[in-house]
Amino acid sequence: MTMRKRIAFLAGAISFDNQNRVLGGVLKRASELDMDVYVFTCFVNYDESEENKVGAFRIMDLQEFDLFDGVICMKNSIQYEPAVNSLIARIKKSKVPAVSVDEKVDGMYNVGISDYSSQKDIVEHLIETHDLKKINYVCGILQGKEGRERYNAYRDAMEEHGIPVCDNQIYHGNYNRESGRKAVEQFMKYNMPQAIVCANDAMAIGAMERLQQNGYRIPEDVIVTGFDNDELSEFFVPSLTTVDRRQELLGKNAVNLLFERSDDVNVQIDTKTIYRESCGCNMQPAMEIKDLRMEYQNKCLIYEEALDSLKCMELDLTGLENIDELCEKMKKYVVGSDMQSFYMCLCDKNEMFAYKSVCDHFTEKVSIALVYQNGKFCSDVDFLSKVI
């Protein structure tokens, strides 16, 4: 019997829509090829403390890449340099075929888009079609390729049209919705711009929320644009002008690159700029459609609140030194959720407590310290970490 091929997929936080859509493309193509995908991810924001990042990104140390037939890595999504450097070094050492999504990495295949030209198209649209001059920008993490290229595109488009940019027109965000809200609060301290261009959709939606809360109309008073074409961008009221990165196609092409062995090690996917209501284009006045979109928007916000609650749980559990206390606290969260089953894995208890300070690696043996199935908690189980 022929063994199914195995792909390791590595991403910083698939709770973000853009990462989740790439994964969706990987899963769909792998299913068509009768392959298995093993997902290694965590739930971490870009502004986490050093301690939380160290713990969260340890999952990236679990893989033995020699056991896989290929690796797909979303390098830019892992916003913690020590983890990224270690991960890339281990992938290269394994000699297993690997694809980097978005950012190019020496020795690996690459599939990505032109962040620069896509962002520049939006800024030029605002200048040339809407005749705007005061355009502020909410940038992402400038250490990453996406954030850097999108920011440079904004600055270049403004400069090429002879429009000066002041420091107070720039807000340095970290891709989450709260960054968009805080950006608007900063901009409100000065004269409000005609438009706010955001480096991703989450920040754009946060900006629109805060603008609406303060009585600003979009696009009549302030135009807002995003980037990524997240699911909510189409249904938010008003719908968001954005760039469709075609993430699912990125994922499918990543799988193809692994196993088709093309001579072209770099594949660039064409993006599509989608002009919607938030910039004054393609207005949709039908009230019944607006009501449906508002209903969907509210459901998405409830989902976001659930993710925030999960984050609070993680912070509540961080730093506990007693495993029994950890299990008891965890039980309250599990029972209060809709989960049908839950497994909490911990390093070997005896070895873990032999360390005077923080244990910086996974122990060889791992214990499932908490098991929840069919409404009941069960006894724990030990196994080797490498078989995860």
Describe each PLM feature range.
Residues 1-49, 53-336, 340-343:
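Bacterial carbohydrate/catabolite-sensing allosteric modules
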Residues 345-388:
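GAF sensory domains
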